């Protein structure tokens, strides 16, 4: 579907320079001289590179509709991650590097959303929050109560995050998978 350059909004996926790009930020600019344009920060969906482009209102770009399907994580097999389509029960195999660092957050039966373009997976979205156990937490140092302080802790999946001083080993916490930050106790 063709849209004008000034209609691009954050989250839109467009076809540009032979690739698929998602608009991260947009800024409508109206200079004193010359025509108005839309300054757009784009991120490539395949390799993650970023690009800043200007689109004039008269320019048209192809907006792409991505199909989003729900999958359930089944298991890990070497460097492959196996998911199952919840509607057709077909299995989908994705490489760990496709999911990236967030593959460590995958748990058996976890529901994820896979974005498909022409039946080919191009992106995956994990839940925003997961509940994990703390395996290691440094002891509290007395006298650090004057300012808000955090101490490092290791989650059951091996990822290190800062947590408040009252969290101890063995506790379950809710973690933000996008920012890798502590949210609350479970």
Swiss-Prot record:
Pfam hit, one: Elong-fact-P_C
Protein name: Elongation factor P
Chief location bin: cytoplasm
Family annotation (PROSITE patterns): EFP (PS01275)
Biological process annotations from GO: peptide biosynthetic process
Database matches in PANTHER family: ELONGATION FACTOR P (PTHR30053), TRANSLATION ELONGATION FACTOR KOW-LIKE DOMAIN-CONTAINING PROTEIN (PTHR30053:SF14)
CDD domains hit by this protein: S1_EF-P_repeat_1, S1_EF-P_repeat_2
Cellular compartments per GO CC: cytoplasm
Organism: Brucella ovis (strain ATCC 25840 / 63/290 / NCTC 10512)
Entry keyword set: Cytoplasm, Elongation factor, Protein biosynthesis
GO molecular function: translation elongation factor activity
NCBIfam families membership: efp (TIGR00038), PRK00529.1 (NF001810)
């Amino acid at each position: 579907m063709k849209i004008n350059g000034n209609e691009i909004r954050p989250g839109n996926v467009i076809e540009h320079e032979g690739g698929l790009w998602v608009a991260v930020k947009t800024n409508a600019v109206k200079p004193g001289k010359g025509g108005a344009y839309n300054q757009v920060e784009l991120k490539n969906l395949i390799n993650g590179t970023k690009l800043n482009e200007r689109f004039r209102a008269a320019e048209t770009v192809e907006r792409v509709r991505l199909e989003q399907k729900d999958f359930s994580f089944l298991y890990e097999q070497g460097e492959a991650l196996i998911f199952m389509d919840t509607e057709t029960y077909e299995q989908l195999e994705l490489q760990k590097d496709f999911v990236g660092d967030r593959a460590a957050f995958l748990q058996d039966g976890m529901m994820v959303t896979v974005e498909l373009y022409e039946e080919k997976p191009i992106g995956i979205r994990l839940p925003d929050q997961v509940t994990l156990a703390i395996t290691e937490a440094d002891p509290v140092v007395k006298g650090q109560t004057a300012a808000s302080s955090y101490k490092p802790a290791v989650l059951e999946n091996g990822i290190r995050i800062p947590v408040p001083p009252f969290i101890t080993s063995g506790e379950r916490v809710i973690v933000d998978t996008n920012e890798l930050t502590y949210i609350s106790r479970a």
